[in-house]
Each structure stands twice: as structure tokens, then as C-alpha cells.
Amino acid sequence: MPMNKDRLYVGLYACGGGDRMPGGEDSDNGNVEGVRYDAKERMTKSSKTKWYFEERRGGVDGNGMLLIRLIVAKVPQPSELIHILRQVPVKQGLPGWNCVAWVKEALEKIEAHGKVLGTHRAEWLDVMDTALWYVEKKKPEHRFDGQGDYDINNVPTYDLMESKETMA
């Protein structure tokens, strides 16, 4: 793949606390340059949580917490993609809603637009299933527990469009 083409990645990050998603989507590393779009949760002064949208340019590794990433699309129209991502709402007080639900909705809105992505494989079930499979594949290789001999600056990357690993 030419390196000068914009790509859409979906990253799976380690998060604190126990698993919260019924399908295990949030169960259980390098500095990647780009822009991170995400729904994040933070505590308020009243000890409640509030969701907010984050758009952050620069390193998107989440302070070393990026477990894996998937290449899901070529992006010939980055400005239109950015516009769509900025419009995906964060939802307060909805039981079970979290950052995984935000990514699902974002991918669905991008797919519905129909003209933002070039070559792609961004259907939610494919993305979710592949992300969970890829993390499970990396666990016995000791990619996340510190026992393996890996450069933490190289995030395991799987190209969903070509069905192959591009960085172990």
C-alpha cells in the first residue's frame, strides 16, 4: 500500500475496570501519528460520569494502551470523513452505551454516506469480529503481557481489506 494515502483505522485500546460489553468487545505499544476520534468518559465533580467527543492530532497510541489496530478503508475524501465523525453524537445516560457503541454508529454513518471511502471493509460485524479475533491471536504470542520480545512502538496491525497482518 502506498504510504501517502489516507487510511481509516479502528484501534482496540486497553481500558481500566472490568469488561462491560456483553459480547466481550471491550475485554482485554507504539506511537502512531494521525488523528484520533473517540468517545471518552470522564468523572464530573458530582462523581458521575459524562461522555464527550475527543479529536486529538498527533500520537494516537493512548499512552501505550493501543493493543491492536485494523486498517478498514482507504480514504480519498478525508474532509468529508472528518465531517461525519464530528457529527456522531455521544449519548449521556443511556445504559450500555460506551465508546464501542460510538465506533459502531460512526462506521454505520460512514457506510450509509456511501461516497467517503474508497476500497474498504468497514462493516461493523466484520470489524468487531476481526478485532476480537486478532487480540485473541496475539495473547498467546505474549504481545500484551510483557513476556514477549516486541518493540512497543510497533502496534500489531491487521489489514481487513486484504485479510493479512501488516505488522506483528
Cite the ranges covered by each PLM segment:
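N-terminal accessory segments that precede or flank the first globular/catalytic domain
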Residues: 1-41
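Compositionally biased, low-complexity repeat tracts
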Residues: 7, 12-14, 20, 30, ...
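Residue-level marker of intrinsically disordered, low-complexity segments enriched
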Residues: 8, 30, 70, 114, ...
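Low-complexity, intrinsically disordered/propeptide-like segments
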Residues: 11, 15, 28, 56, ...
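Intrinsically disordered, low-complexity, compositionally biased regions/tails
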Residues: 15, 28, 38, 68, ...
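Cysteine protease-like catalytic core of ubiquitin/ubiquitin-like
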Residues: 29-74
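Active-site nucleophile-His-acid catalytic modules used for acyl/amide transfer and hydrolysis
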Residues: 57-145
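C-terminal helix/juxtamembrane-tail motif
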Residues: 141-168
